[in-house]
Curated annotation (Swiss-Prot):
The keyword Amino-acid biosynthesis does not apply. It comes from Clitoria ternatea. Probably participates in a plant defense mechanism. One of its GO terms (biological process) is defense response. SUPFAM superfamilies: Cyclotides. Expressed in root, seed and nodule but not in flower, stem, shoot, leaf and pod (at protein level). There is a cross-link at residues 26-56 (Cyclopeptide (Gly-Asn)). Contains 3 disulfide bonds. This is a cyclic peptide. The keyword Signal applies. Pfam families: Albumin_I_a, Cyclotide. Belongs to the cyclotide family. Bracelet subfamily. This is Cliotide T7. It comes from the Eukaryota.
Length: 130
């Protein structure tokens, strides 16, 4: 009897999981943005389009120009101007003329921050190490 209950629980969990998986792609993020922008779902990667919150990749896939979405770019300068990152990654599809803005932390940025550290802190860490 316990085996039958356990099998039923696994069956229900699997059916719910597959039902959710099928509806993920094009469904809005769950809130409207008529008067206020996507607030809670913005952390989940949602943006406002046509007064409904959609996932960013859905909006970007339907975009015709770079100006249709704040994360789309054609160069690194587009990302700087829009304030959405510092690196424009090109699309994997060769027929798509735009890319996606990312905030990239490279070794140059880390070195720049390291060079701004006061000299006293560097001496202190050397004393602690000895």
């Amino acid at each position: 009897m316990a085996f039958a209950r356990l099998a039923l629980i696994f069956f229900l969990a699997a059916s719910v999981m597959f039902a959710v998986k099928e509806t993920e792609a094009g469904i809005p993020c769950g809130e409207s943005c008529v008067f206020i922008p996507c607030t809670v779902t913005a952390l989940l990667g949602c943006s406002c389009k046509d007064k409904v919150c959609y996932k960013n990749h859905v909006i970007a896939a339907e975009a015709n120009t770079v100006n249709d979405h704040h994360l789309l770019c054609q160069s690194h300068e587009d990302c700087f101007k829009k304030g959405t990152g510092n690196f424009c990654a090109p699309s994997l599809k060769h027929d798509v003329k735009y890319g996606w803005c990312f905030r990239a932390e490279s070794e140059g940025f880390l070195l720049k921050d390291f060079l701004k550290t006061p000299v006293d802190i560097l001496k202190m860490s050397n004393v602690i190490g000895n």
